[in-house]
């Protein structure tokens, strides 16, 4: 894991890939992880559940975050905190970069 010595734009760390979700783990510790995801438009992460609390932060773009069947439109600079063991899914409404923080 490379931690930059100088400030770096977080959205420049990862690039979009056509018809895919690209992931890059930025930090992995005993108490949690931080992962950057780049979703191409209409790509989705379906029926996920985390055993830990998570924070979903949209850095660029827009997602439809479904939690227990309820849609939440999350846009650039907005975030959503999700308790452990709650089912969720993410669909990118446009090309979107998301920072996912898991706290154990």
Regions found by a protein language model. Give the residues of each.
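Conserved short histidine dyad/triad with adjacent acidic residue
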Residues: 20, 33-50, 76
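Glycine- and acidic-residue-biased ligand/ion/polar-headgroup-sensing regions
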Residues: 52-64, 68
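Structural motif
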Residues: 33, 62-64, 87, 97
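Short acidic-glycine-tyrosine-enriched beta hairpin
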Residues: 69-84
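A cytosolic small-molecule/anion-sensing beta-strand core signal
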Residues: 59-60, 75-76, 94
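A short, N-terminal "cap"/entry segment at the start of jelly-roll beta-barrel domains
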Residues: 1-31, 66
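Ligand-binding loop in jelly-roll beta-barrel domains
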Residues: 84-104
């Amino acid at each position: 894991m490379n931690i930059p010595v100088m400030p770096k734009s977080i959205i420049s760390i990862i690039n979009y890939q056509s018809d895919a979700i690209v992931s890059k783990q930025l930090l992995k510790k005993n108490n949690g992880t931080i992962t950057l995801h780049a979703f191409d438009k209409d790509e989705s992460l379906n029926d996920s559940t985390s055993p830990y609390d998570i924070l979903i932060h949209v850095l660029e773009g827009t997602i439809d975050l479904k939690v227990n069947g309820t849609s939440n439109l999350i846009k650039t600079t907005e975030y959503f905190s999700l308790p452990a063991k709650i089912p969720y899914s993410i669909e990118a409404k446009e090309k979107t970069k998301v920072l996912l923080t898991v706290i154990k």
